[in-house]
C-alpha cells in the first residue's frame, strides 16, 4: 500500500509521487489549505490538501485525530520560513492528490500529546494508544535494535542461541514460583522459570561450550517500585573459563552497545571494587560512582565515649558508626535536616545526628551540633580529620546495626546527590567482586547471597562447612550508575563441594536429590569448569534510553500490583476449568 516510511521522505524525493500510510497526528486549517501531520512508525510528514483538489479536500475536511489514512501525492519543498529542522522530512511536504480513509477512530480517552496529565493505569489500559507516542515507540524500537546487536555480537563469538523450557520444576530460588497445574498429572505442578540457571549449566555439561538466550523469567515476589513479575534476561554461559574471561567479554559487549547507540566511550577496563569496599564506602553493593559522597567509618572512635547512642553500636559486633560528609552542607535548613531524618527512618534509622562545620579553624567553637557535648574533643578532632571536613560542611552520622547504617546512609548519599545535583560524569560502570558466599541476620539460617550453585574461592568443602561466614564466592556484578545491570559467577562443578554448600544452607542430601537431582546427577558425568552471567535487559534498555521506569521499555507491562489493565489479568476462570485440573479455590485473599 505504501512506497515509503516517514523517515525516508526528504529533499531527495522532490517532484516524485509517493504513497504513505499512517495516522492523522494533527489536522490544521490555514488560509483555505488543510495541513495534516501524518504519523507512521518512523516519524511525521506534513501533507497539504488544496481546495483545487476537491475530492481530496472533502476527505481532508472529515478527518480527525487518529483516523487511519493512505495518502498519495507529490513531494514539494516547503515554503521559506516553514522548514521544521526537528524531523527528517522537515524540508518537504506532500501535495496530496489522493487520500483514502482506511479507518476511523472513536473519540480518544486522552490526547496522545497530553499524556503527562493521564494516570499510568489509564495509559496502560489503553496501551495501544500510549504506544503511539513517538517517544514510547522510539524506546521499543531501540530495545529491538539493542537485542539485535547483542545477538550479532554473541553469534560472531561462537555462542549458540538455545531455548530452555518454560514449563519446569519448582525449586527454592528465593522468590515464589508461578505454578502451572498439570491436567495429565493431577495434583502435580510445573513452575515458570525464575531463571534458566540449572538448564544452562546442564548445557555446559552436554558440551555446548557457549550458550546464550534472550529469555523471559518469572518471579512471584512482592513488587518494589521498579520490578515486574515477568521480565527479560540476556542469559549466557561458557565452559573452560575463569572470571576474567567472562568479565572481559561482557565489558567489550557493553562498551560496543554504548558506542554504537549512544556514541559514548566507556572505560577499558571497567574498574573493580570488592563487596566489602563497596558496603563500607558507599553503603551498598550497587554504588553509583558518579556520586562523590562517601561513608567514613568511625566505629573504633566511639567504643569508649559516654554517649550511649554511639557507644552501644560501637561495642556491638554487628554494629557500625559511619559519617557522611556533605561539602557546603552547613547551609541546610532545620526543615531540610528534619526531612532527611524522616527519610533515613524509612530504612530503620532511629535518627540522624549531625555536626555543622561553620569554621574549621576555631576547633569545637566553630562547630554546631546537639551532640557536641557528648563527645570528647580528641574524638571530634579525629572525626574531622578522617572525613577531611572543611568550613561550610555538614557531617551526618549513622549509628546502629551495620545493615541499618549502610542502608540508611547509602540511601541518604543517593538522595543528597540527586537533590543537589552532585553527579560527576554521565556513565560510571564498575565490577563488584569478592562477595560473601553466605549471609544471614544476627542469628538464623545461612542463605546464599547469590545462588547455591556459585563457586567459592575456598576449595576445601570441610572448611566451607566449618566457617561459612568466612567464605568468599567467585561471583561478580556489573553495576552502572547505581543499577545492577548484570550478575554472574563461576559455577560449582564438583559434586562434593555442591553437597557442602547445600549442607550449609540446611538442605539435606535427600532434599537436594529431590529438588536438584537432575543437576547433581549431571555434575557426576564430567562437568567442565563453567561460568556465566545474566543481564536484566529491561533495566539495561531503560538506562540506555533514559526511561524513568522499566515499564517504559516493555510493550505491555504489569502495574506495581502485578496487574494488566489492558486485559484485566489476572482474572477468575470457569469452575469447569478448575475441576478439569483438580483445583478448588478455597477463599479469596485480600
From Swiss-Prot:
InterPro entries: Aa-tRNA-synt_II, aa-tRNA-synth_II, aa-tRNA-synth_II/BPL/LPL, Asp-tRNA-ligase_1, Asp-tRNA-ligase_1_N, Asp/Asn-tRNA-synth_IIb, AspRS_core, GAD-like_sf. Its main location: cytoplasm. GO terms for cellular component: cytoplasm. Gene3D superfamilies: Bira Bifunctional Protein, Domain 2, GAD-like domain, Nucleic acid-binding proteins. L-aspartate binds at residues 173, 219, 450, 491. It catalyses: tRNA(Asx) + L-aspartate + ATP = L-aspartyl-tRNA(Asx) + AMP + diphosphate. GO terms for molecular function: aspartate-tRNA ligase activity; aspartate-tRNA(Asn) ligase activity; ATP binding; nucleic acid binding. Pfam families: GAD (PF02938), tRNA-synt_2 (PF00152), tRNA_anti-codon (PF01336). ATP binds at residues 219-221, 228, 484, 536-539. Residues 197-200 are annotated as: Aspartate. The keyword Zinc does not apply. CDD domains: AspRS_core (cd00777), EcAspRS_like_N (cd04317). It is an enzyme of class 6 (ligase). Its EC number is 6.1.1.23. The record marks 30, 81 as: Important for tRNA non-discrimination. GO terms for biological process: aspartyl-tRNA aminoacylation. Homodimer. Belongs to the class-II aminoacyl-tRNA synthetase family. Type 1 subfamily. NCBIfam families: aspS_bact, PRK00476.1. This is Aspartate--tRNA(Asp/Asn) ligase. The lineage of its organism: Bacteria, Pseudomonadati, Pseudomonadota, Gammaproteobacteria, Legionellales.
Amino acid at each position: 500500500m505504501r512506497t515509503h516510511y516517514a523517515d525516508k521522505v526528504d529533499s531527495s524525493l522532490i517532484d516524485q509521487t509517493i504513497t504513505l500510510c499512517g495516522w492523522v497526528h494533527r489536522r490544521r486549517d490555514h488560509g483555505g489549505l488543510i495541513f495534516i501531520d501524518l504519523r507512521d512508525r518512523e516519524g511525521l510528514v506534513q501533507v497539504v490538501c488544496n481546495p483545487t483538489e476537491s475530492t481530496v479536500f472533502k476527505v481532508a475536511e472529515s478527518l480527525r485525530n487518529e483516523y487511519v489514512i493512505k495518502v498519495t501525492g507529490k513531494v514539494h519543498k516547503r515554503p521559506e520560513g516553514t522548514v521544521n529542522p526537528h524531523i527528517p522530512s522537515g524540508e518537504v511536504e506532500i501535495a496530496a492528490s489522493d487520500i483514502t480513509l482506511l479507518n476511523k477512530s472513536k473519540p480518544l480517552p486522552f490526547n496522545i500529546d497530553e499524556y503527562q496529565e493521564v494516570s499510568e493505569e489509564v495509559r496502560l489500559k489503553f496501551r495501544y494508544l500510549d504506544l503511539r507516542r513517538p517517544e514510547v515507540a522510539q524506546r521499543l524500537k531501540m530495545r529491538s535494535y539493542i537485542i539485535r546487536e547483542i545477538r550479532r555480537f554473541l553469534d560472531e563469538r561462537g555462542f549458540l542461541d538455545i531455548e530452555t523450557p518454560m514449563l519446569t520444576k519448582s525449586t527454592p530460588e528465593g522468590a515464589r514460583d508461578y505454578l502451572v497445574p498439570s491436567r495429565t498429572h493431577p495434583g502435580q505442578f510445573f513452575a515458570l522459570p525464575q531463571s534458566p540457571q540449572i538448564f544452562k549449566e546442564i548445557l555446559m555439561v552436554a558440551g555446548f561450550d557457549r550458550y546464550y538466550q534472550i529469555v523471559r523469567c518469572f518471579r512471584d515476589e512482592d513488587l518494589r517500585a521498579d520490578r515486574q513479575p515477568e521480565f527479560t534476561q540476556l542469559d549466557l554461559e561458557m565452559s573452560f573459563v575463569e572470571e576474567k574471561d567472562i568479565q572481559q567479554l561482557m565489558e567489550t559487549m557493553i562498551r560496543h552497545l554504548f558506542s554504537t547507540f549512544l556514541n559514548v566511550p566507556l572505560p577499558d577496563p571497567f574498574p573493580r571494587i570488592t563487596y566489602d569496599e563497596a558496603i563500607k564506602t558507599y553503603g551498598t553493593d550497587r554504588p553509583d560512582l558518579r556520586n562523590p559522597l562517601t561513608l567514613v567509618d568511625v566505629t573504633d572512635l566511639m567504643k569508649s565515649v559516654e554517649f550511649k547512642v554511639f557507644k552501644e553500636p560501637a561495642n556491638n559486633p554487628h554494629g557500625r558508626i559511619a559519617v557522611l560528609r556533605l561539602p557546603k552542607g552547613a547551609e541546610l535548613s532545620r526543615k531540610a535536616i528534619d526531612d532527611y531524618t524522616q527519610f533515613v527512618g524509612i530504612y530503620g534509622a532511629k535518627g540522624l545526628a549531625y555536626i555543622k562545620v561553620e569554621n574549621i579553624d576555631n576547633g569545637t567553637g566553630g562547630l554546631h551540633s546537639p551532640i557536641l557535648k557528648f563527645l570528647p574533643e580528641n574524638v571530634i578532632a579525629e572525626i574531622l580529620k578522617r572525613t577531611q571536613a572543611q568550613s561550610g560542611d555538614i557531617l551526618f552520622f549513622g549509628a546502629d546495626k551495620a545493615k541499618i547504617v549502610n542502608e540508611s546512609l547509602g540511601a541518604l548519599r543517593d538522595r543528597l546527590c540527586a537533590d543537589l545535583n552532585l553527579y560527576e560524569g554521565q556513565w560510571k560502570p564498575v565490577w563488584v567482586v569478592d562477595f560473601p558466599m553466605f549471609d544471614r541476620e544476627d542469628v538464623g539460617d545461612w542463605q546464599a547471597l547469590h545462588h547455591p550453585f556459585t563457586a567459592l574461592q575456598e576449595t576445601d568443602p570441610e572448611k566451607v562447612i566449618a566457617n561459612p561466614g568466612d567464605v568468599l564466592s567467585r561471583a561478580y556484578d556489573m553495576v552502572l550508575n547505581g543499577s545492577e545491570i548484570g550478575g554472574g559467577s563461576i559455577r560449582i562443578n564438583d559434586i562434593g563441594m555442591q553437597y557442602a554448600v547445600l549442607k550449609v544452607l540446611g538442605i539435606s542430601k535427600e532434599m537436594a536429590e529431590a529438588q536438584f537431582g537432575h543437576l547433581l546427577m549431571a555434575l557426576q558425568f564430567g562437568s567442565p569448569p563453567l561460568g556465566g552471567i545474566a543481564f536484566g535487559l529491561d533495566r539495561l534498555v531503560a538506562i540506555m534510553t533514559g526511561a524513568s521506569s522499566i515499564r517504559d521499555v516493555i510493550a505491555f507491562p504489569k502495574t506495581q500490583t502485578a496487574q494488566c489493565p489492558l486485559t484485566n489479568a489476572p482474572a477468575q476462570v470457569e469452575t469447569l476449568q478448575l475441576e478439569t485440573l483438580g483445583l478448588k479455590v478455597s477463599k479469596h485473599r485480600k
